[in-house]
């Protein structure tokens, strides 16, 4: 308010957080610029400030699910967008985690906007076989990164050599099949039984048992017994 034709002191440009002042206008539609005159006009006038949105920073924070089920915040990622506009940052992909759906947020003028993405752990199917194309020892879904213990296996006559491929300490990021590998054991005892024919009564009588050793799965040839000069009588008496 001032007297007609008095000097006008141009005011400082107004300030609005997140915006840049772009001049005065005569109309609300901001189509006709207005220049503040040097002298007070003879009537009141309403003028309108034009504002242009500025780039303002915002953050994306990723929360990865821990093996204990608790989500842990990662280091924030900084972005920028125009004040009061909507932004939809694309969530990053992390191996072993489900990628969340995109979220839309409005960029606040004060720079406090935070877009939060939560990443649950994926589950993968693991199968343990006794041998190639053999019996299934275990088959189940396991959460990525959790502690992994292979099942105990036993195979008579064989020594366990490990799993193929090697079983990691934690669940891998993918379905896997692990096969037990074996080595045939040495020194496995077996018996050779020798029977002699009963000439009078017919049939055979066990004469001797020899205990020998070999390797599991190998074919063995038992040594022949030396009974060529012996004739067995009914009551077990020997005659030459």
Residue positions per predicted region:
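Secondary-structure capping and domain/repeat boundary segments
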Residues: 1-228, 233-240
């Amino acid at each position: 308010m001032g007297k007609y034709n008095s000097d006008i002191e141009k005011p400082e440009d107004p300030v609005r957080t997140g915006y840049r002042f772009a001049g005065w206008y005569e109309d609300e539609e901001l189509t006709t610029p207005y220049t503040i005159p040097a002298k007070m006009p003879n009537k009141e006038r309403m003028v309108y400030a034009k504002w242009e949105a500025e780039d303002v920073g915002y953050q994306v924070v990723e929360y990865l699910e821990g093996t204990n089920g608790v989500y842990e915040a990662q280091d924030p990622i900084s972005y920028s967008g125009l004040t009061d506009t909507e932004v939809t940052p694309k969530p990053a992909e992390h191996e072993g985690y489900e990628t969340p759906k995109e979220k839309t947020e409005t960029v606040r003028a004060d720079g406090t906007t935070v877009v939060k993405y939560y990443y649950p752990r994926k589950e993968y199917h693991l199968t343990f076989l006794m041998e190639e194309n053999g019996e299934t020892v275990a088959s189940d879904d396991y959460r990525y990164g959790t502690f992994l213990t292979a099942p105990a296996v036993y195979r008579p006559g064989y020594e366990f050599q490990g799993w193929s491929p090697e079983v990691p300490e934690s669940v891998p990021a993918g379905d896997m099949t692990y096969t037990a590998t074996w080595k045939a054991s040495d020194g496995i005892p077996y018996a050779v039984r020798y029977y002699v024919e009963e000439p009078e009564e017919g049939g055979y009588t066990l004469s001797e048992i020899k205990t020998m050793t070999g390797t599991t799965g190998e074919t063995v040839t038992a040594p022949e017994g030396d009974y060529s000069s012996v004739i067995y009588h009914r009551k077990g008496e020997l005659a030459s």
